[in-house]
Amino acid sequence: MKMGFLFLFCYLLAFLGYSPVDAAVKKYQFDVQVKNISRICNAKPIVTVNGMFPGPTVYAREGDRVIINVTNHVQYNMSIHWHGLKQYRNGWADGPAYITQCPIQTGQSYLYDFNVTGQRGTLWWHAHILWLRATVYGAIVILPAPGKPYPFPQPYQESNIILGEWWNKDVETAVNQANQLGAPPPMSDAHTINGKPGPLFPCSEKHTFVIEAEAGKTYLLRIINAALNDELFFGIAGHNMTVVEIDAVYTKPFTTKAILLGPGQTTNVLVKTDRSPNRYFMAASPFMDAPVSVDNKTVTAILQYKGVPNTVLPILPKLPLPNDTSFALDYNGKLKSLNTPNFPALVPLKVDRRLFYTIGLGINACPTCVNGTNLAASINNITFIMPKTALLKAHYSNISGVFRTDFPDRPPKAFNYTGVPLTANLGTSTGTRLSRVKFNTTIELVLQDTNLLTVESHPFHLHGYNFFVVGTGVGNFDPKKDPAKFNLVDPPERNTVGVPTGGWAAIRFRADNPGVWFMHCHLEVHTMWGLKMAFVVENGETPELSVLPPPKDYPSC
């Protein structure tokens, strides 16, 4: 589908009432409803927002108040997470089911009411219950406040590029069947760009996303990895990309032929249409440098110069190989914060509390499973059990018996985390255990991958905060040597960090946002297996530094 993106973008801004003097409240209605969709020769009903796949883009400006009424018309419980929005003191609007809210039940509505404070750039929203985010997701575009230009050349046009996955089967049915077996769910059947798999898949010529471009212009692409289980390379045939933002934080610009995004991450790039007029494939394919199966198929969209006929065959880009670890490490090493007077990198230099979390897979007994066991995942050997009452409500109202606050700062036993694969004694502890944090504590957290069953990369997302990725490495983290190599000047600031396969990532943040904040692997299969936990950040000393009261329409469990 071809679109005049500049016209559409300007139309949306006008429709939403943007102007330099009048940009305060943006209101949206999200109707969660079923719609029949056909992809790669298969038709099925899917859960959507407003009948759109992907769902509608939320546009706002830095400083706006956003009010989104979500009405659930489907058989499943629903909740929506606004991925990357900090929700200061307002976890009630964060969205993860049974963490900050009870889900929205069939026939009910919930008003997500939040402020966009101190943030601008590309984020996204998605369902945060079951595997419904397979089809329930969309972009969030936060424009700079009036009078604050981009810290890079003004683009001629902007376009959203949302990378996703498609299953021919009903996803929830497939997941339930896998859980009964105690096995992983099936891989997706295709990747998508803006819901379309592109012409390399059968029955997909008309399901191809197209950008019609003018020669000699600069385009801003807002790229989002909304896939459930795949890290993805992205590139454009014949064109370089200049990275200018990650996870809605400006970066020092650098040019590359391909980018890498883990699930949950966003990247903004500038693309100059300075090649000979032609049709060029934009493509995405998986990165996997561990012995784990992935949907190793390439999704394509088209960058088409104006005046070039549709009969011209597009040119394919040369993306990195699926196991190109060196590219991944080199690419991530180039990501750095701007750290300018207007956009400082406020890295905590003094650390109040150091945490060391091991990430691993396991096998637990499962009497109801066909094989008698099921796969599990854990942090510090604890597999998280979802509560039946929202954790934030239990914390706010002092409801006992819902969770414990004794999540350990370190694993129960030290071992050679990334040595030979460990395949015995793989049982994990289970529980709803949280880590209690005093307000304004500065935290350094090292996330260490382990070779329990297998090593694997893990995109970890922290709700309620951005953090600085001060260091990464391959192998076991060395607390005596590795901190000396930390970047404390201009490290990348993110909300989702990729922990390297068989390696570690160190992050720092200041716990100045009171509430209950979820942290989990953004590979949906690992989250389902329990690779998650939460922080309970205590209130500050004044009401202005404390959790706001819950809204009147707060859902009940």
Curated annotation (Swiss-Prot):
Cellular-component GO terms for this entry? apoplast
> Any signal peptide, and if so, which residues?
1-23
Using the record's annotation, list all stretches that form the Plastocyanin-like domain. 31-147, 158-308, 406-541
Q: Which family does it belong to?
A: Belongs to the multicopper oxidase family.
**Lineage of the species this protein comes from:** Eukaryota, Viridiplantae, Streptophyta, Embryophyta, Tracheophyta
Q: Which cofactor does it need?
A: Cu cation
Residues annotated for Cu cation 4 binding in this entry: H458, C521, H526
The name on file for this protein is Laccase-11
